[in-house]
Amino acid sequence: REVKKNYAVPRKTEIRDEIVDIKLDAKEMIPDEKCVIVVTNDGYVKRVSQKSFSSSTEETTLKPGDYVTNKFMASTRDSLLLFTNLGNYLYVPIHILPEVKYKDLGKHISNTIMIKEQERIVASLILKDKSKTLTLFTKKGLTKQVLLKDFEVTRYSKPMMAIKLKDDDELINADTSSDEVLFVTNNGLYLRFNTNEIP
């Protein structure tokens, strides 16, 4: 009682009947680290720290006949979209990609998300401005526009359909930057139109 009398202090916490739910954004738990993403024609994808990229004096390692199709500045909180010739897309949170040195070969995307043997990457982009529209192009001249936000998913362990294709068709590109589209046929004819004419 003597101790309580001499050292008692008012309670600093409040006791309440109800429990307040605390919702955490999983994305906020991921360290925000700047990095470089390298994508190759054969489907190799790697994440490189900005330091490794800036200090490297060697070219990135590639398999014979392979070449780099895209190189992005990104954050570990971003996601990478990869589109395949079979009309599918892969949603790849960048933080799940192992960090390697710029000169290293990296891993084939099938080590992260399983794709078919005949499936190959035809386009790639970093998912940032989800209000943008993506235009998909097929070998047979089919076009389709989709809002980037529609590609965001919570489960990404397998490829998902971006566009439904006929058996003899395949996806050849996906692009967000074009205001106009120019199609050229194998017999030398071409068709030019504005992307706002695409449904």
Describe the residue ranges of each PLM region:
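Short, structured "edge-of-domain" segments at secondary-structure transitions
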Residues: R1-P199
